[in-house]
Design a protein with these regions (language model features):
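A residue-level marker of the well-folded mature domains of exported/periplasmic proteins
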Residues: 3-5, 18-107
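Bacterial N-terminal signal peptides
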Residues: 7-15
C-alpha cells in the first residue's frame, strides 16, 4: 500500500513538468482514522524523494467549514500543488474552485 501511495504522489508531483518545491495536503480526518496517517506518510515520503517540502493539514473537529478554511489558508501560501480529500463537494467546492482559479495544481482524493 505504501509503495502504491508513494508512486501516486511521485506521479502527481512530476506531472507539472517541473521539480516542485512545496506541497500541501488537506484531509477531513478528525485525527482518529488509521487510514490518514498512511496517506500522510505517503505524501511525506514522496516529497522527500523529490526534495520537496510537504505540509499535512486537517481540522481536529472534522468540520467541513473548518476544512474549507484550511483550503483557503493553504491556497494563500501558493504551494506548488495541493491534494484535498473531498467528503462534501457542496461545502468544499467553492474553496477548491478558488484554489484552481488561483492557478494551483490540485487533485482531490
Amino acid at each position: 500500500m505504501k509503495k502504491i501511495l508513494l508512486g501516486i504522489f511521485i506521479t502527481i508531483f512530476f506531472a507539472g513538468g517541473a521539480l516542485a518545491e512545496r506541497y500541501v495536503m488537506v484531509t477531513h480526518t478528525a485525527g482518529t482514522d488509521p487510514f490518514w496517517p498512511v496517506v500522510q506518510k505517503g505524501g511525506e515520503d514522496a516529497a522527500k524523494a523529490i526534495g520537496a517540502d510537504f505540509e499535512y493539514m486537517f481540522h481536529p473537529s472534522g468540520d467541513m467549514a473548518e476544512m474549507a478554511k484550511l483550503i483557503v489558508a493553504a491556497t494563500a501560501t501558493q504551494p506548488d500543488g495541493m491534494v484535498v480529500s473531498l467528503p462534501d463537494p457542496d461545502a468544499l467546492g467553492p474553496a477548491i474552485q478558488d484554489a484552481v482559479a488561483a492557478g494551483l495544481s490540485l487533485i482531490h482524493i
